Amino acid sequence: SVIRQLKEAGFKRIVMMTGDSERTAAAIAKRVGVDDYFSEVLPEDKARFVEEEKAKGHKVIMIGDGINDSPALSAADAGIAVSEGAEIAREIADITIKKDSLDEVVLLRHLSMDLMKRVHGNYRFVISFNLGLILLGVAGIITPSMSALLHNSSTLAISLKSMTNLLPEEEREEA
């Protein structure tokens, strides 16, 4: 299930908030497997919940599709709107997913994790390489012009490496 995939991707707590009745909310929550749910929730209650979770030190992602989700989308650390939802929700959200499915959120999480790995790896390489150039220059092993050439070459190489696609080929066709 998508909820299980979100958990495996690092989401610690998944809460459903809905304006629907208790009975409807309970049935949906049980079927999809969220950690907790709240029914008959007003828009300001959603935003208040987001603010309370942030005050506890949690990072909060809010996913919504309607006008009533807009205050919470705005209050969240990251707001995600569904493209078929209300225009105001899409405008307020940080991210808009194209499908009415949480599978896109799982893909976004994996992409963001892969991107951060790439950024940190590139950073470590650049720092190490430049430190090596400085040490070789101080030791008199390479000339300043050679150091500049190697530095610029490494910058170009890292830039080209950074432009490679993170998405698997089958995902690229869908995106």
Model regions: which residues?
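Conserved ATP-binding TGD loop and adjacent catalytic N/P-domain core of P-type ATPases
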Residues: 1-121, 173-175
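Membrane-embedded transport module
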Residues: 93-175
